[in-house]
Regions:
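N-terminal hydrophobic or amphipathic helices and topogenic motifs
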Residues: 2-110, 115, 124-132
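Hydrophobic Val/Ile/Leu positions in short beta-strands of Rossmann-like dinucleotide-binding domains
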Residues: 111-112, 156, 222
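Hydrophobic/small residue at the entry helix of a nucleotide-binding pocket
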Residues: 118
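Adenosine-cofactor binding site in Rossmann-like domains, unifying the SAM/SAH pocket
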Residues: 133-146
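Rossmann-fold NAD(P) dinucleotide-binding segment
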Residues: 145-148, 156-193
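An anion/phosphate-binding loop that grips the pyrophosphate of nucleotide cofactors and donors
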Residues: 151
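Rossmann-fold NAD(P)-binding glycine/threonine-rich loop
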Residues: 182-212
Length: 284
């Protein structure tokens, strides 16, 4: 049976429906604003008790519950999960204004290379966590001896090509200072740090770039060096920031990174070979 096309004004029929949609969208905005206020309060509580920004079990349980609710309500569960994940990413932003200090507030952290892109990211994180942060660069290296004195942490955040050279040139560090690095290879830098400093040493590799908005859910590889009990506060600080920590020996880390790099180069080679075979015009 053919449907009869209405001769009524379509805009007159659509208008009340669109008004209902506008009202519902407005309510959504109000609900999101209320949720943001609650998550900001959650952030303050987490800061008070030194709790991690990201708790995977809580996030997974929340998504599972809302997916089930969506299915019961006849709404796409995938849609609800997509919306929730975007909302949760925003909530991490609202919780990141300040963090608890996992050592003593005001303790000194020296970031060698802190004016660089990744170094700046960690300077900001430590400052927002209540640490006194100083940046050591080539142009103020003459102050290195005074700067590292009394530091809780000396963090190496320089280009990989000069990492071991910079470590070797560090002045003597206090016995309770933690020496750590952020280099993307671990065997060489970790060996250099162990040779330079007789106390606590740990290798770190943040698996992200400096352009991220926050480090919640970002992976950081930890390669233990020496006196792990002395840098547990640093490990806890990364957890408070929301990072996901995974432990690998320096050798394991570098072997895996070589495999990853090989796959990246292989992918680029395959793409290039395919473009050449197709005689693609790269100008277009």
């Amino acid at each position: 049976m053919n449907k009869v096309v209405s001769t009524e004004d379509p805009m007159a029929a659509l208008l009340p429906l669109r008004q209902q949609i506008d009202q519902l969208d407005s309510q959504l905005v109000e609900l999101l604003a209320k949720r943001a206020a609650v998550t900001a309060e959650v952030g303050r509580v987490k800061q008070q008790y030194a709790l991690p920004l990201y708790v995977p079990e809580r996030e997974q349980a929340l998504i599972k519950a809302r997916r089930q609710q969506a299915e019961e309500a006849g709404v796409s569960a995938d849609l609800i999960e997509d919306v929730l994940r975007r909302v949760m990413r925003e909530s991490y932003q609202t919780q990141e204004a300040g963090f608890v200090c996992c050592r003593t507030s005001g303790d000194k952290v020296v970031v060698v290379g802190g004016a660089g892109a990744l170094g700046k990211r960690f300077v900001s994180l430590f400052q927002r966590s209540g640490y006194q942060v100083e940046v050591l660069e080539q142009d103020n290296w003459h102050q290195a001896k005074d700067m590292v004195q009394g530091a809780a942490l000396v963090l190496i955040a320089v280009p990989i090509a000069v990492t071991q050279l910079v470590i070797a040139q560090l002045p003597e560090l206090d016995s309770d200072t933690v020496l750590a690095d952020l280099t993307s290879t671990k065997t060489g830098p970790l060996s250099a740090m162990l040779a330079k400093h007789s106390s606590a040493v740990v290798g770190l590799h943040p698996m992200f770039g400096p352009d991220i908005s926050n480090i919640a859910k970002q992976v950081v590889v930890v390669s233990h060096g020496r006196d792990a009990e002395k840098y547990q506060w640093l490990i806890q600080q990364f957890k408070v920031w929301g990072a996901v920590l995974t432990e690998k020996s320096a050798q394991q880390h570098d072997e895996l990174m070589q495999l990853i790099q090989a796959m990246r180069h292989f992918s680029s080679l395959v793409y290039g070979a395919h473009l050449a075979e197709e005689q693609a015009d790269l100008q277009q």
